[in-house]
Amino acid sequence: MYYKVLGQQNADAETVVLSSGLGGSGGFWQPQLAMLSAHFRVVVYDQYGTGASQGSVPAGYRMEDMADELAGLLNALNISRCHLVGHALGGIMGLHLALRYPALLQSLVVINGWTVLNSQTRRCFDVRRNLLLNSGVDAYVQAQPLFLYPGDWLSEHEAFLQEERQHQVANFQGMENLLHRLQALMDSDLTTSLKGVIAPTLALSAKDDLLVPWSCSADLASRLPHGEHLQMGYGGHAMSVTDPDTFNPILLDWLQRQASHPSGTPSDFIPVEMP
């Protein structure tokens, strides 16, 4: 998989891994890179089958497969302990990673995530999937900002949105890849397994998120042994993009609080074959 390692390179630097949502591209985290790189070693990557991580995502693909792919990448980089920050799909993948490799995660941040798919999120995914299947890639990409950003922010960033639309159409992950990744996300159900997540976990929500109601994050945190819920009042589903001035200090404070409080007992790290 395509990745970049940024920031601190000293031997005792702690590592923060950034995992994006359904789009999969590490470029999503641009507003956080400078801030995080000043304090941590930062790993940012394109998920398998997206961006520069070329490949065909098979039918029957699961969130567990995504977790194993990231574990394999980190093993190849000799990273046996890290903080993981995941947005939506990336955060839910992080929960699966925490269950499969408990010694790997020092802490976890799940941004606008959930325990099991909410009816509102399912409704939005069904609309987006129907757009893709019935109207094509450009229509899917054109509609995507409606689910990600607040209305006033959309009105004020027309040039950005046009540039983003062109870029996303040109670099689209492919219909089958997206549909298989989306199905894996929709099928994930952590209702009975969250008690096994030993890593301290921040469930961070946005009150005005159209795609994932903030109550999903509150529910998620309440089910975790070491869960905490924080809420931003503004920013939509992609509040790390729309309001980094609020988001970044929240994220940095959490990571710095967890840096000196490792969770669990390190055990042998299991190598995973890369796809």
UniProtKB/Swiss-Prot annotation:
UniProt protein name: Putative carbamate hydrolase RutD
InterPro entries: AB_hydrolase (IPR050471), AB_hydrolase_1 (IPR000073), AB_hydrolase_fold (IPR029058), Pyrimidine_utilisation_RutD (IPR019913)
Gene3D superfamilies for the chain: alpha/beta hydrolase
Record field: catalytic activity: carbamate + 2 H(+) = NH4(+) + CO2
Keyword check for Transferase: no
Species whose genome carries this gene: Pantoea ananatis (strain LMG 20103)
Organism domain of life: Bacteria
GN (gene name): rutD
Coiled-coil residues: none
